[in-house]
A protein has these predicted regions:
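Helix-capping/helix-break motifs at membrane-protein junctions
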Residues: 118, 151-152
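CoA-thioester-processing core
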Residues: 64-127
Length: 219
């Protein structure tokens, strides 16, 4: 079965920011409103996915604005410092827009950045001050926007070790742990049902690799 879901992107981050600005400027239009509501629903489904999520930010990635929400929804994120040996693409960047600060709340009612910097207004303000800037790996790691930043010497090995490590665990047994980490802070009726109850009833208490005779939680 599937244990880990890896997110990658490819494109022009400046173009993504331009689309974000367009949607914001036209947010009262029915089509722009529907697009944003659809993205809101899709991102919530990512939040509630019962598998380990990892984002890989490499040269050529376009994790900016709305697409950067995918990085913030993941359990871990890895960003390459500089370029791959022999590569000719510019170094990876992450960029923020207003879309990261309100339009796409999680099931618990706060943004993914508010969840990441829970009750840490200073860090959240520092991140907000960088809206519109193309942040390289060192800057993103320093701000706390990614889990790890590695150069090309360690890159392949670190990604491989993480994927092998995560796949060696019971993906269903990890669901509760990951739900607790993803949904810190306030509880809403939505998060109580879909982030808590569903995780335990539909995955942990039902799945053979979690609670079966040889399941991870019965060893």
């Amino acid at each position: 079965g599937i244990a880990v879901i890896v997110f990658k992107s490819e494109g022009d981050p400046a173009q993504v920011l331009a689309y974000d600005a367009f949607l914001e400027a036209n947010k009262t239009n029915w089509l722009a409103r529907e697009i944003r509501l659809y993205w809101k629903r899709v991102l919530k489904r990512v939040d509630l996915t019962s598998r380990s999520l990892v984002a890989i930010v490499e040269p050529g990635s376009c994790f900016a604005g709305t697409l950067a929400e995918i990085v913030f929804a993941c359990d871990r994120s890895y960003m390459l410092v500089g370029q791959l040996n022999g590569g000719n693409r510019p170094p990876a960047t992450i960029a923020l827009s207003g879309a990261n600060f309100g339009p796409y709340p999680m099931p618990n009612g706060i943004t993914r950045l508010e969840s990441r910097f829970l009750e840490d207004k200073k860090s959240l303000d520092a991140v907000h001050a960088k809206v519109g800037e193309m942040l390289d790996a060192q800057a993103a790691e320093k701000l706390g926007l990614v889990t790890f930043a590695f150069d090309d010497i360690d890159w392949d090995d670190e990604i491989r070790i993480f994927l092998e490590e995560r796949a060696s665990f019971s993906p269903d047994g990890l669901t509760g742990l990951e739900a607790n980490l993803r949904f810190g802070g306030p509880e809403t009726m939505e998060s109580k049902i879909f982030a808590r109850l569903t995780a335990w009833q539909n995955w942990i208490f039902q799945r053979p690799n979690a609670v079966g005779e040889e399941g991870a939680l019965r060893r």
